[in-house]
């Protein structure tokens, strides 16, 4: 899903990965003391404000900072609509301002995580258009959508490549494409492609981004939905293509359920999900994280 309230990134380490070393080492050191907290679109908009309406080019406004006195460790941004050549993403955030937010957050010592909700390249619908189960197959080499998706991928790479620090060095980011792929709500999800097709999509995408475009400063993160995690093992593209494993797990208020009951159920289920994720991460020697979570509307102060 698209994080609507907030994203909380809890980074835990089971072993070191190979790239980029400085970011992985930082995550590892933090995991031994205090987990990192992340907030989606933190510098872009908040309660009754929007960076697009501000003259503050340093991107200093943050709801988290207003409440806690500090910026979140991790800033989440989404590249949906970059593939279409638009100036703003699917949330209405200007891509130029997003890039500046990433640079400012990095300069303050923060970490950037990027997701991507690409439109359905077959139907022209949104990422949530799962009406055609041939899309991934048609994107793969030999398919009629292959060239189109390569152009889309190059547009993603162009934006990521623009993220340079004040010394012109590439800013490292946690990169989380094709997420919640064990669910059925995205065109790359479990109801729209086979495990083999999904893994081939990941391999193809990775090859273009890393080997063809040379974007090495990426921590590749994969994150299934917690509700369909039994499908994760067969839809895992391989250790050489993944640097971090995550899971997206949200809080919901079921019909007839009190807020207190929902809160208790969420705490219990989160512990269960993280225990499962830890086991998978240890098996593959990867760091792991709670990559998306939240409660829409924040109707519970706890």
State where each predicted segment sits.
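Aromatic-lined carbohydrate-recognition surfaces of secreted/lumenal glycan-active proteins
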Residues: 38-40, 176-178, 202-231, 285-298
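Structural recognition of the beta-strand scaffold that forms the well-ordered cores
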Residues: 35-39, 72-79, 111-116, 173-177, ...
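Alpha-helical scaffolding within the catalytic cores
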Residues: 22, 52-64, 96-99, 156-159, ...
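Glycoside hydrolase catalytic-domain groove-lining segments
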Residues: 229-231, 235-299
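N-terminal module-boundary/linker segments of secreted carbohydrate-active enzymes
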Residues: 17-80, 85-92, 301
